[in-house]
Amino acid sequence: MQVMSSARLHLKTAHSALTSARTRRWAGLLTSFLAGQGAVQVLNLITGFFLLRWMSIESYAQFSIAFGFQSMLQWLVDLGAVGSIVALVGNRGDDKEVVGKYIRSAKHFRLRLISITIPLAAIVFWFITSKHQWPLSLKILLFLSIIGTLCFQGWASFYSTPLLINQEIRRFYRPQIISSVWRLALCFILKISSALFAWTSAWVSTSAVAVHGLIYKRGAKPLVIEPEKSDPSANREMLHYLGPTIPWVIFTAFQGQISLFLITWFGQTRNVAEVAALGRIGQLFLILTVANSVVINPFIAKVPRAKLFRRYVQILGVSLGIASSLCLLAFLFPRPLLWVLGPKYMNLGSEIGWAVAGASAGYIGSVLLAMHNARKWIYWWWSGAHIVLLITIQIACLFMLDLSTTLHVLYFALITNLAALLILLTVGAYGFICGPPAKLA
């Protein structure tokens, strides 16, 4: 009996030590994430809100259209390939050749997509901006900055992934902090030099992406052995993973900026600046959205099936609580947020709560999407249902809302995000019942 009691005591002690070690590890990761993302978030918020105050309404509208267009193209030239690397590598993160193989496959697809997308994008960019009488030289400079950002963003996306796989959170955030300081400093220099225009701001952003992309590329060398050519089998595996999501990604690329593009087409330059400024308030959710890929995605990918439902509900519940609280505060106390936007936008008191509501719905959807991707709940019917429902609702909104006004564009964004959220909840229920598709299981 004494021997058995002693054995139980040793087992209990070992279990407690293991639990304590895991707790310390996750606490360390969470602390590093909050410190790193907090620093990046604060620096980017400061820069963004300084630009709101420093730039004229016309210059800010021009810069915002270029930024929105670049964000859309970033989705189109990636199609989720970079995000798929974590799921495809799985628990083989210590194998440098495996990580390098999938990075090379992601490059394979990105290079081909860029060569197709850029010529088409040039035509669309000219069409979108044709309503506004802006100089041709300005449009060319803005579009060239978009191309430059796309090229350098590839470095940042590919070579930051090995750091996430190995959960080296500090090394993941260091380059972003450096480039954020770089961007803020250059914007300040341009301001005091009276040279802060739309195109100069756009090129400063491009240079910041180049800085942290180069640092990532150098820092990832010890973690990756990248082949000279992509592996056809890895390409096929990645394509099987991405296939069901490609229609959704293409559609979402346009959806992400549709509010800005609609107000650009239907509204005036001031309306463009207002929608873009209110979009800055959505950055309240940026630190939480980044947590999807840095914390939630790797965590859910490793959760045992028996514990998945509980973890899923816990994460969803926390995200709902955070989003609801921020939304309520924005409606009840809009003045602090208006002060942050600056004196040019103090007339947006009735709009700011709706902007946060739309961002809240989008954030909750991003949490669900991160968990679904981590479990490989990627279905062809999901993309089709998502696209059909949203297009149907948006066509109805075109007839019901006055999209030349800032407030109605915000209503449009909120309704769209709620519809997308409904589809994602359906996907989650189906995933628990049926699991991932056979090709991805």
What are these regions (language model features)?
Residues 78-94, 164-165, 282-306, 373-374:
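Helix-loop junctions and terminal segments of transmembrane helices
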Residues 150-174, 301-305, 357-384:
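Membrane-interface junctions at transmembrane-helix termini in multi-pass inner-membrane proteins
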Residues 6, 24-86, 149, 243-270, ...:
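Signature of the first transmembrane helix
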Residues 24-40, 66, 75-128, 305-327:
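Membrane-water interface segments that mark the loop-to-transmembrane alpha-helix transition
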Residues 1-43, 97-100, 104, 230-245, ...:
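N-terminal membrane topogenesis motif
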Residues 140-144, 173-222, 385-393, 404-431:
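Hydrophobic alpha-helical transmembrane segments
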Residues 23-46, 107-112, 143-147, 170-177, ...:
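Hydrophobic faces of transmembrane alpha-helices in multi-pass small-molecule transporters and flippases
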Residues 127-145, 269, 332-360:
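Interfacial segments at transmembrane-helix termini and the short loops linking adjacent helices
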